[in-house]
Amino acid sequence: MVHSLPMSLTALLLVNPVLTIGFILLFIGSLISMSLNWREKASVRRHRRYRHTAERLLRKLPTLAGDAQRVSYLRRVNPYVFEELLLLAMERQGLQVIRNASYSGDSGLDGQVFIEGQRWLIQAKRYSRAIDPAHVAEFSALLIQHRCGGLFIHTGRTGAKSKQHAISSHSNIFPLYIISGQRLIALLAGNPDWIRKNQ
């Protein structure tokens, strides 16, 4: 009995078109899978880089001359690093934090924190001037939609319209608190007074 040698892969693919299509689909599927894994890894790397930068900033802020210089420095920070900085500072105070899956496309929600068992949404904004009252109004609507309170944390000035909008929300069951200036610095310094001033 004579044993024939197996056909080469090329000859097999030429003879059997179904097998050829199967190999092509397998190859395309592998490329898509590698692309998705690379993209996921890039987002994980980016998140890790923002977190490391935020950790460095938390160490650097106390070395700056005063609160005005600290706020000025924060205004120049990458917006995603600023978000991570706030969440990291809250975690270091023992608060449970929920991060978004991604930094952009968050519909105005930059994270969540649980304070004394109550869920609060976080909106982080780096402003060099007065905050836009429309941003405060949009965030207030988001609080109603999510049925919880919110912390609008920013580096700018809080104008009269924004203050009024936040004050009027306190009569709602979903209050909105604006954290900036001294309270922002207290939060980043690990001083729990920033929370008590909300209550």
Regions found by a protein language model. Give the residues of each.
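Mixed-charge (Asp/Glu-Lys/Arg
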Residues: M1-S107, Q112-Q199
